[in-house]
């Protein structure tokens, strides 16, 4: 979920991603480590802030309070996710966040198979179950698909600007040559 929070220095709002987590979330992400404070208690209005969020946004430091989803949330921990995008997120109890944002179902579930080569069999079994409406993807594929739309937009924008500026340069050169003659 995206929320808007004011930045510390400018007070201008900027978007921040909120992610619901469970008890094993840090174990699932070995690159993420708690640097300050503690993990949120399940069922509470406590959150973890990524280092980037804690540093850049008002109210996102440890012990501070953020208001979103018509509720006050206390930052009880700060985590470092290295150079990943997770450092720009806020994490809280998944069930509490689902209630706050009136979500009826999880948008994604992340888990680790004991044998990575069993993924294809797992995918076939889950996707063929008529009770479920899911699409199983490896996490790397999920994020690649997410960024593909933006990459396509940027390619089209870049090509369009290149053509426009090229035409402008050609016309400018023609006008200059005509004026010189």
Task: Label every PLM stretch briefly.
Residues 39, 55, 65-74, 78-159:
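Mechanotransmission and gating elements of multispan inner-membrane complexes involved in transport
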Residues 151-181:
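Hydrophobic alpha-helical transmembrane segments of multi-pass inner-membrane transport and secretion
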Residues 2-42, 75, 91-94:
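The feature marks short, hydrophobic/small-residue-biased sequence motifs that occur predominantly
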Residues 11-18, 29, 42-46, 61, ...:
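Extracytoplasmic
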Residues 24-31, 49-63:
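Short, solvent-exposed hinge/capping segments at secondary-structure junctions
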Residues 23-30, 103-109, 162-168:
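Short, basic, helix/turn surface patches
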Residues 22, 49-50, 93, 139:
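A secondary-structure boundary/capping signal
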């Amino acid at each position: 979920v995206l929320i808007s929070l004011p930045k510390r220095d400018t007070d201008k709002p900027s978007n921040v991603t909120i992610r619901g987590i469970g008890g094993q979330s840090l174990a699932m992400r070995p690159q993420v480590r708690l640097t300050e404070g503690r993990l949120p208690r399940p069922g509470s209005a406590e959150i973890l802030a990524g280092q980037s969020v804690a540093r850049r946004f008002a109210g996102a430091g440890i012990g501070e309070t953020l208001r979103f989803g018509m509720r006050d949330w206390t930052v009880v921990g700060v985590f470092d996710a290295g150079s990943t995008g997770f450092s720009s997120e806020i994490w809280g109890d998944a069930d509490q966040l689902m209630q706050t944002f009136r979500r009826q179902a999880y948008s994604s579930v992340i888990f680790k198979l004991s044998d990575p080569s069993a993924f294809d069999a797992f995918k076939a079994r889950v996707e063929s179950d008529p009770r479920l409406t899911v699409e199983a993807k490896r996490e790397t594929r999920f994020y690649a698909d997410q960024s593909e739309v933006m990459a396509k937009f940027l390619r089209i924008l870049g090509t369009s600007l290149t053509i426009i500026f090229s035409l402008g340069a050609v016309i400018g050169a023609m006008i200059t040559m005509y004026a010189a003659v």
